[in-house]
């Protein structure tokens, strides 16, 4: 398959571009459910004229249903998207990239979703869908699942369902609150996952960033001790990787720390660890 795609790129480069464009249109409409042409053109970064021409082709093939209310993918379109997914991953070069990352970091599996989740809500939605799909396959009976906060984990939570309710599973926050939107808090995401899967959940009502004295004081509370012990039993932990400076500002760190992170080349953050572009830890904050 990889060789066929390479040959096609050489002999029919225009065909490859057209295929990618129409796939992105169909995929975006499927994610949106029902969408207008102007809104879709804006989110895809193309003119309405170009989009109109492509929509006409997709409609004529029976892949789109167009009405006064907007556009939606037909049953035939959904089936086509499911069948073409592996081919498109090869076409975008994602399969090869997944394997390279898997080998480089010694991982069992890597899944890459096309698009820029920072710019496109459709890409963030697909990232959440992929995460929910993997989690469904990994969770076992009586598992404790720890989750952090953030927009990506919120998308995973909103799309997570089990084939049948599993009250034996428990979802818990893997960190405290960051003072962000309540929808993005770890507590909210844990409860959403539990409600959507028929599981249980526990909440942790403490801020993420604490001084040593405050931390030691909180750990004397029996209720806090109990939930922390449950969290430590988590077999699965799901976390996002945030922008270093954005996460530092959410923790309301002082300007000198922000400046130090910039000087150290901090690019990403997870669980209070700040990493440079090469993956080296350049700073640590207690969480």
Language-model features, listed with the residues they occupy:
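N-terminal active-site beta-alpha-beta segment that forms phosphate/nucleotide-binding
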Residues: 73-76, 84, 88-209
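Short, contiguous clusters of charged residues that form electrostatic/catalytic patches at enzyme active sites
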Residues: 23, 27, 125-133, 154, ...
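Flexible, glycine/charged-enriched surface loops at secondary-structure junctions
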Residues: 67-68, 143
